[in-house]
Amino acid sequence: MTRTDIERPVRTQAEEKARYEGNKLSKRLARETTRALSDYNMIEEGDRVMVCLSGGKDSYAMLDILMALQKRAPFRFELIAVNLDQKQPGFPADILPNYLSSLGVPFHIETQDTYSIVTRVLAEGKTMCSLCSRLRRGILYRVADELGATKIALGHHRDDILGTLFLNLFYGGKLKGMPPKLVSDDGRHTVIRPLAYIAETDLIAYAELKQFPIIPCNLCGSQENLKRKEVSRMVQEWDRKFPGRSWNVFNALSRVVPSHLMDRDLFDFVGLKPTGLPDANGDIAFDEPQTDDACDASAPTDGLNEQQIVFSRFS
């Protein structure tokens, strides 16, 4: 027995199991992020990616994963972390600079007192989130220009995408979600969501594993959007009672069949006529819908964009 063996601390069975589960979680999140980046061609050679960091679990995880992938990527790209200090009361201004300095990642803290603007404009008791979000978005677009960023990375995850889909469906009468990649309204910025394939439960576990210095998200005193909270509870209930159901809905977003919906802008129902030729996928009008919640839908589908350059795989 060597001296190193004697000095090495002996892990308990519980510690070994926790270490194993932590490694497995880290690899899974890296793998799913890699898949999203590849499927939607989110990051390309020479990109300068502005990683929007709020101090919450999702954006911390996004930065951590992207930094790991940056080392394994088959091409070069830059990361710069950006936080917007909106001067909310009690915001701990030292936490993020200290954390980012310890990582050695380039970062920029933008200070803009949007809190005072929102509280002055809105009546007392009104939800601040919508106006605050619009102000924040405009500032981040400006900062992206100033920093020369070619991509803006946001930390929205699978549950955020599902929540937006259901909010639009239930309260807006639209089949509209939250895309993994988009161009801003002014046509100048590409916004990406690298965590699109990751469930919130995994991000909660990852934050606990990594012990991120989380900053509370309710410092402004605004109440959480009750409708979004409602659909979030619904998805969480599904995950508990019907494993696979929420993934089925999520996967449906990339398996759209316009001929079997009702949008005349997506399919020419008006001009539809028999062609006299058989169509294997055409006559399913009387098929029974699949109702098995437990089908194999525990993760996003592969191969959405296989021609794209892929990152080194995590086994």
UniProtKB/Swiss-Prot annotation:
Binding of [4Fe-4S] cluster, residues: C129, C132, C220
Segments traversing the membrane: none
Manner of cofactor binding, per the entry note: Binds 1 [4Fe-4S] cluster per subunit. The cluster is chelated by three Cys residues, the fourth Fe has a free coordination site that may bind a sulfur atom transferred from the persulfide of IscS.
Compartments (UniProt record): Cytoplasm
Function: Catalyzes the ATP-dependent 2-thiolation of cytidine in position 32 of tRNA, to form 2-thiocytidine (s(2)C32). The sulfur atoms are provided by the cysteine/cysteine desulfurase (IscS) system.
NCBIfam families: PRK10696.1
Name by which UniProt lists this protein: tRNA-cytidine(32) 2-sulfurtransferase
Source taxonomy: Bacteria, Pseudomonadati, Pseudomonadota, Betaproteobacteria, Burkholderiales
This protein's encoding gene: ttcA
